[in-house]
Amino acid sequence: MGDKILREHLLNLLSGRGAHVDWKDSFSGIPAKLRGIRPNGFPHSIWELVEHMRIAQRDILEFSRNAKHVSPEWPEGYWPSAQAPPNAKEWEKSLKSFAQDLGAMKKLVANSKTNLYAKIPHGTGQTILREALLVADHNAYHLGQVIAIRHILGNWR
């Protein structure tokens, strides 16, 4: 049995199951005209959040599996320069990249050869378990912001 149950729980958490809305539902049906709006009181648009999530998730994934990875400069390297996507193609490209990286993190977690508890050799004490939880937590936080913005803009259920 080992850590099979823990891996299943992590995969569910990364997938947004349970108490969370999954990322696909969070980003589905957002008209292009709303993607770059910063509602009153919100510091970011949906596009900025999507890109921030993509960039941060990629950084965490690459840190987890690549000793030569260099993280972006904090904080500016983790946020897009534009408030809105330049076009629909870039929006779709960002979502596709987000999905691929999330899938790669899930694959890393699901692989029984991945030691979830071992310290990442090039880190400062981090483990794959910690990095997977960080991805899930970070995504859940910002997906909540996306849904809040969608509510304010009248674009949520």
Question: Where would I find each of the regions flagged by the language model?
Answer:
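Short, contiguous alpha-helical
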Residues: D3-H20, K24-F27, A32-P80, I120-R157
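Acidic/histidine-rich alpha-helical segments that form the ligand environment
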Residues: A82-K119, R130-V135
